[in-house]
Amino acid sequence: MLIETLSVFPEMFEPVMSTSILGRARKAGLFDFKAYNLRDWTHDRHRTVDDEPYGGGQGMLMKVEPIAEAIEAISAEGPKPTVVFFTPCGEPFTQHVAERLLKASACCLCAAVTKVSTSVPMRMPTSACRSAITCSRRRASRYGRCRCRRTPDPGALGDEMSNVDESFSTAEDGGLLEYAQYTRPAEFNGEGVPPVLVSGDHAKVDAWRRKNAIERTCRWRPDLIETARLTPEERAYAQVILDASYSQSEE
């Protein structure tokens, strides 16, 4: 089995893959590992992998072109891998999913601090979020706890406001999943950016984002709706979506 990672910090993974249980399994030939640098598939002087989101807002988004080129190049080197993209909006990454991936090569797209344009998952065979899996000595979960505790600290991020409306944040979005975000190009492989995000009308952009956040939360994490801070109108809209989803599941 071949495990691959695609990120802007490939040096992070080699120590993990060479230590403890993973290290022994790798030495025994149970799996092979490669870490790719996403910047190797950029074509500008600064090796840029991210850009500002359409519609404005804090933070940056990883661009789709370098990722698409990287996946195509990696696939050409050997068996086409299942691409695993970790996101709050996706199939729960359970132990069952992890075991299923053992049957094929897997390439994990790691976004680090920068988020990924919504255009990217449209090309992915698999999307998943971190959830119930078995980890040796819980190192991975401890790392995750350190990240979530220290990320809000002043100076940890280039723009401190970029953490405000993230998924699960209780500051601005009321505990909803984050709305879909897009960055350049405006169209990629026939998939375009929602026109409202390039309209320049900030009020309409804010309204679209709020509605989209509710829709995404209803689809992927309906359990969050009960505790989310919603207006009566928003809660009624969410209930319509949930009722429709329940009716479809019953058919």
Where are these regions (language model features)?
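Glycine-rich, flexible N-terminal cofactor/catalytic loop recognition
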Residues: L2-D40
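Hydrophobic/aromatic beta-strand patches that form the interior of the parallel beta-sheet core
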Residues: E4-L6, K34-Y36, V84, C107-C108, ...
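Active-site glycine-centered loops adjacent to acidic/histidine catalytic or metal-binding residues
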Residues: F9, A112, I133
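A short aromatic-anchored loop/beta-hairpin motif
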Residues: H43-H46, D50, Y54-A68
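S-adenosyl-L-methionine/SAH cofactor-binding core of RNA-modifying enzymes
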Residues: L61-V113, T118, G155
